[in-house]
Every structure is written in C-alpha cells, then in structure tokens.
Amino acid sequence: MSWNHNRRWKDFQALVNAEDYFAFFELPYDPRVVNVNRLHILRKFAQYLAPLEHFQGSEEERLEQARQALEKAYQTFLTSTPQQEKLFRVFQDYGCPDPVGGCAGCSSLGERGECSPGIPA
C-alpha cells in the first residue's frame, strides 16, 4: 500500500462523508465530481464494500480492498452517469428512454411518471 499504514478498520467505520473517505485513503479526487455525484459514488462504494463484510484477510488487506473499492466507485462516475448506473430507484423505475440526452425532448408523462418521447406534430 502506498498510503498510511497506521489506519484501522474501526477508524474507517467511523467515517461519514465522501471527503473523509478520500482523505482517509489519501486518494486524489476532483471536488466538482464528488459534489455532483456524491450519493452515487457512496452507493457504488457500498456495493463494492459488501463482499468485505466476511473478508478473511488481515486488517491491512481489508483496508486496501476498501481503498480500491472507493477508487473504483469514483472512477465509475468519471466515465458514466447516475442515469446509466441506475443505483437509485428514481433511475430504475422512472428512467427516461433517452438517458444520454435527458428528458428535454419529452412532451408528456406516462401513467407511472415515466418520461415519454415527444410525439411529432
């Protein structure tokens, strides 16, 4: 590991916000990316962390796995969007048929609030 070896799992578990996680693991990040995608990065991070719940390696190895999970979650949102990742129900149930272009071209809402493409005149 290239970061501080004095970190402990219990210290990691006490962290509460994205910036704290990046500081803890000494990972560089663009604050603009984190500000826009904060909840999505943390949700993706939690998904990647789930398998570590039963991790049998050392504390240092576990922390390295967590560090890699955060880096992977962050990297995801450098090349993808929340709409593409569909981590939250709003993007799963009520997705726009055009996730790249957004809903600007939509003219009506379907029964469940789905975005419906505009009908040509």
From Swiss-Prot:
GO terms for biological process: nitrogen fixation. It holds the Pfam family NifW. InterPro entries: NifW (IPR004893). Keywords: Nitrogen fixation. May protect the nitrogenase Fe-Mo protein from oxidative damage. Belongs to the NifW family. HAMAP family: NifW. Homotrimer; associates with NifD. This is Nitrogenase-stabilizing/protective protein NifW. It comes from Synechococcus sp. (strain JA-3-3Ab). The gene is nifW.
